[in-house]
Amino acid sequence: MGVPAFFRWLSRKYPSIIVNCVEEKAKECNGVKASVDTSKPNPNEVEFDNLYLDMNGIIHPCTHPEDKPAPKNEDEMMVAIFEYIDRIFNIVRPRRLLYMAIDGVAPRAKMNQQRSRRFRASKEGMEAAEEKQKIRQEILAKGGILPPEEVKERFDSNCITPGTEFMDNLAKCLRYYIADRLNSDPGWKNLTVILSDASAPGEGEHKIMDYIRRQRAQPNHDPNTHHCLCGADADLIMLGLATHEPHFTIIREEFKPNKPKPCALCNQMGHEVKDCQGLPREKQGKHDQFADSLPASEQEFIFIRLCVLREYLERELTMASLPFTFDFERSVDDWVFMCFFVGNDFLPHLPSLEIREGAIDRLVNIYKNVVHKTGGYLTESGFVNLQRVQMIMLAVGEVEDSIFKKRKDDDDNFKRRQKEKKKRMKRDHPSFIPGGQFSPQALGNRSSPQAISNPRQTAFEMRMHDRQNSTMSSPNTSLNSDGSPSPARGIKRKSEDSDSEPEPEDNIRLWESGWKQRYYKNKFDVDASDEKFRRKVVQSYVEGLCWVLRYYYQGCASWNWYYPFHYAPFASDFEGIADMPSDFEKGSKPFKPLEQLMGVFPAASGNFLPPTWRKLMTDPESSIIDFYPEDFAIDLNGKKYAWQGVALLPFVDERRLRAALEEVYPDLTPEENRRNSLGGDVLFVGKHHPLCDFIVEQYKSKNTEPVDMPPELCYGIQGKLTPNENAVLPDKTVESPVPMLRDLTQNSAVSISFKDPQFDEDFIFKATVLPGAKKPPPVLKPGDWEKTNNDGRPWRPQLGFNRDRKPVHLDQSAFRTLGHAMPRERGMPGMYANAVPLGAYGSPYTRPLMSGQQQIPKLLSNLRPQESWRGPTPLFQQAPQRTAGAAPLLAWNRMLPAQSQYPPGQYQGLGGPMSYPQRPEDRMDRGRQAYGPGRPYLLPPPSGRYSWN
């Protein structure tokens, strides 16, 4: 979604919506990895019914990852996608339905954004390749050492678009994957799987929402179904709220900024391409055994609990003394609608509303102040009341001028603080501090040595700094009156106040008077006094707001509508919108896949199109050559970076495009015609599913007509089933489209075409909670907790899905022991991470173990709940006889789980119970005393350095 900072703002404002996922890792024995049994209870202590996968959010990171080497070929990409789905399935473990949705042909309103993204990706890819080649030649000319350039074809991510051979092959691979899991994985035993590939029109997340809406409208639908949607787009949160399902959770990757990446030239860590010096690669390990290994950093996942977000919104949106009855569900719909003004995939955001400036909070406050005058809510089941929206927007327009001035003041203050900070740091720090192995270390850190990483790079930086110092102190360098060296003659001294990066030119200057005239003149090339044009822009934007809300709540209102401008109007221009029409043409049809490719692809990606179609992009005599500019301008629009700007691409004229394609349609081969046709969804079940026999019977009877799906056999799911060609059938071999994977010779799964329940075009899906739905128990601290809490118990926040989870504690000696095994300073390498992984203590609501933490469960093997501890383990069980050559016995790491009630006469010191009198000298020498009588258990050493000899 077009709100890059929306999730960051949401997670900071409503922190309790986030829960870290618990993932059960596969165990490895003798080099063989045993798969996880997903039929067992979910380790997150919650059971999900349906899992929906927005597949494009999986395909992109698997085909061109940013934090690890990319797959070498298409087969490896498919395997990476399979493994990613396995991870998500292992975490969520759905019990009823798995719905995989790949983006199909998008509405025309979305195609403009897709076109901008793909043109940018092509342009940035070529520019990056040229810059890389330029830097490579410069380094080699200076005598630098670089690995030989690997000759390989660059993966064009634009192929992840409906109609390409890649997407067609992906659909085949996913059908094979589903059949394989239904045959072999016990967690898939009773699961219904629906695959909506790229041939089915619609965006992936909206196909999922359309399925949920249509199933909710059925009488057999379970109103307490627990949904889990996988995807990283911010609009999934709004879509989940729009369903009004009380049990809705989103799972997504946890965003971690500034991940280390290898240099694209020398493949070494620690610098970017622009800073590469072409230094020889350091030996990694004694025998260079770690040469090709990158720092292990497996992606982690988080849950977003929309039920908790609803709790937050209920507190924030509840209003008293309204002239009408307060309805929380309607207020949630209004909140979703107001978020559209900040940005979305179909409309540019209003100039005065920035998510980073608290625009949503500002809108909510105005909404709560004005709603008493409006006489009702802004929306109802996806339809907008424009008269009430006009009151909100004009209220925003009244403060637009102050918003722009405050934005300028905040920006100037930020720059001033940054300059002062740089000056202060330059004054308070020495001119040069060596880093890496040469950096000065405190005496207390000698017990935690830091690994040497790329010392040649560090030595090079030190030599360069020495040269600069020698230049400054050379005889040709004159001295100022205060004795400081001054630059040599002929060299222009850099201003101390100059910024390292030039500021983009802003011709609009929204903080100065006349901003509206300058805006319309620069952005639309019209005078602000042209009231007719301004009203046209506002009307198009209002149509867009109505179209987007209808898209979220009722489905696509029109496949052909789009916003025909690059920029949005001002909020103060929303006058007289109450009488503007907001109806859309009925019966519109989506583009065909190859037609969409012609509408969104640049000429550089024309190799994914048939030859004669490709020629229309490059032939100077082509009637649509103007749709494919080789270069285009990017308007920063007041922003700092190019990716934040607006790509000024010409809009595609659908009439001209179709007229040009009529001449080349006869050139399509049968295979291309098949890829150019629109398809539907496919349903899969295994042999143990109650629906399996019913589907097999349809094939045996050779029935070709659609039949109603029996809801009693499939958890209330309804729809139409139709036998299809090339179906997966029992006892029929399923050939593997990936050469490295085996064929399924003993298949027992079956597939059939599936179509959602159909409704009249004028049918309205009600945006409300269904009868019989049970509200989840509250998670947030009650506002009257202090008044109603009579026993004085402190409020214990809920960290996971289960409020009744009993916490397990460690005593102080256990934490001290962990402190010995871990580095003292943050950021220093060590065997373990600095944060104690509570997941090893039996808590299912903590982050899974990272690669460096896998040994901690071994250190905590004797961990027991507090109630069951009956004293220390006998000495002979903890200290078995060591043999020569054995690994160091970490018996002192046997830790006690909780602070216990010690027997009388025992001293409770920092390390736990002690059965001997405590003296100051004993405290100092305690860790160096040998085992002896009166000491029933082992004690930890005094520091991380422990001599076992």
Swiss-Prot record:
Its EC number is 3.1.13.-. Residues 416-427 have a biased composition (Basic residues). Residues 783-794, 919-928 have a biased composition (Basic and acidic residues). Its main location: nucleus. One of its GO terms (molecular function) is zinc ion binding. The keyword Transcription regulation applies. It is found in: Nucleus, Nucleolus. Residues 438-452, 469-484 have a biased composition (Polar residues). One of its GO terms (cellular component) is nucleolus. It comes from the Eukaryota. This is 5'-3' exoribonuclease 2. It comes from Gallus gallus.
